[in-house]
């Protein structure tokens, strides 16, 4: 019923609480594993090929919980699912009663911003032109409206901030993938 119930049940039943994600090594999967590590939980991960398969399984009762970033709002609004927490820095306007991980005592914010890259060696003038065009597009009301449909919050980052974010995310997730034994031998 609540995140507190989820954690208590998982602790009392190690390895029995099944949760689905949109696939192995996706952000939802890795974030759930990080949460489990921080809380000392042993969860049963069930990977799916995307949100549609995941949604069918949670609604059909094949899994007990689901970690996904979008697509669940209609089911929550219909009373078929509930949001136990959100992973952003702030609560979602659509689900104001769902606490963030930080509010639940986990020092963790997981966002999956979209970015655009260019080949190494691309002239700075071209990088700046692309950056400025995408920044301008992100400021458009139509962009913000499109994100809101999926309960996503605009998250602008400068070129250098996004580069640092991507590097930090790669480092953190690489360590987690190795710890989980998911890294393929090279």
What name fits each language-model region?
Residues 48, 67-68, 86, 157:
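Short beta-strand and adjacent tight-turn residues that come in two discontinuous sequence segments
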Residues 38-41, 77, 124-186:
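An extracytoplasmic/periplasmic, membrane-proximal ligand-sensing/linker region
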Residues 13-17, 39-41, 59-66, 80-83, ...:
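Alpha-to-beta junction loops
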Residues 41-42, 76-86, 93-104, 174:
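Ligand-binding "clamshell"
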Residues 69-71, 88, 120:
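Short secondary-structure boundary segments
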Residues 3, 51-52, 69-70, 95, ...:
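Structural motif corresponding to alpha-helix initiation and N-cap regions
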Residues 34-38, 52-63, 73-80, 166:
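Short helices/loops that flank or line small-molecule/ion binding pockets
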Residues 1-53, 101, 106, 111-146:
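Hinge/capping helix and adjacent helix->loop/strand transition within the periplasmic-binding protein
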């Amino acid at each position: 019923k609540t995140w507190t119930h989820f954690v208590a049940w998982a602790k009392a039943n190690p390895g029995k609480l099944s949760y689905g994600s949109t696939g192995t090594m996706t952000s939802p999967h890795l974030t759930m594993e990080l949460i489990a590590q921080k809380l000392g939980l042993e969860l049963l991960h069930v990977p799916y090929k995307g949100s549609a398969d995941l949604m069918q399984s949670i609604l059909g009762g094949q899994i007990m919980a689901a970690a996904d970033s979008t697509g669940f709002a209609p089911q929550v609004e219909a009373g078929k699912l509930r949001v136990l927490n959100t992973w952003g820095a702030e609560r979602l306007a659509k689900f104001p009663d769902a606490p963030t991980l930080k509010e639940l005592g986990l020092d963790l914010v997981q966002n999956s911003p979209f970015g655009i890259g260019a080949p190494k060696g691309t002239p700075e003038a071209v990088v700046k032109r692309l950056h400025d065009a995408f920044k301008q597009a992100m400021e458009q009301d139509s962009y913000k409206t499109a994100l809101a449909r999926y309960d996503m919050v605009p998250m602008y980052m400068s070129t250098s901030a996004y580069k640092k974010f991507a590097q930090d995310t790669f480092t953190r997730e690489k360590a987690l993938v190795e710890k989980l034994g998911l890294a393929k031998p090279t």
